[in-house]
Amino acid sequence: MLKIKTKKQGAELTSIQCDGKEMLFDGKTFWNRQSPILFPIVGRIKDSKTEIEGQIYEMSQHGFARDMEFNQIEENHYVLTYNEETLKKYPYKFELHVIYQIIEDTLQVEYQVKNIDNKKIYFGLGGHPAFSCDYSTGQYEIVFDEKEDKIKFLKLKNGLIDTEKANNILEN
């Protein structure tokens, strides 16, 4: 049986239990998050600054959604609506909905970004769940739905992709 817990801060998953076993990282060591939502950017931007429509905006790694209090619409349905604070970092009017549902034995996470502005909006969106794995058992593997071509490992320099250095880490 699958059970989840969430919180309003960042609309973040705090627990995924399968038959009583916790599957999500506890957030106590190494990293103080468990499953942050990355919006309106994924990753870093150079010098934490971007130019939009001729104006400079500062935004930290992965954007601001993970650090904001969402409104809870119903159990496991959260919404973040633009406000004075978000407009200082991101000049677009939006609603970000995060909906968690358990369907049979599967957790489904649905993200909806609604443009409530009178212009196009641009954004990146991602989930960053950290799973609890006991690597000492050797019971884990990554399985792809279909054969993958080469996957490149991109090296980072100051948190940004160093385009001069990339290595193939998976072939066939």
Across the structure, where does each feature detected by a protein language model lie?
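Active-site/ligand-binding surface loops and adjacent short beta/alpha elements
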Residues: 120-122, 130-172
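Short, hydrophobic/aromatic beta-strand segments
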Residues: 15-17, 119-125
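Short, well-ordered beta-strand segments enriched in hydrophobic/aromatic residues
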Residues: 4-6, 100, 107-116
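Hydrophobic residues embedded in beta-strands of well-ordered beta-sheets
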Residues: 13, 76-78, 107-109
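Acidic/His-leaning functional-site neighborhoods
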Residues: 2, 18, 57, 63, ...
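Residues that act as N-cap/strand-start positions at coil-to-secondary-structure junctions
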Residues: 10, 44, 64-66, 92-94, ...
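Extended, loop-rich substrate-binding clefts of extracytoplasmic carbohydrate-active enzymes
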Residues: 55-104
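Beta-strand-rich N-terminal accessory domains
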Residues: 1-52, 56
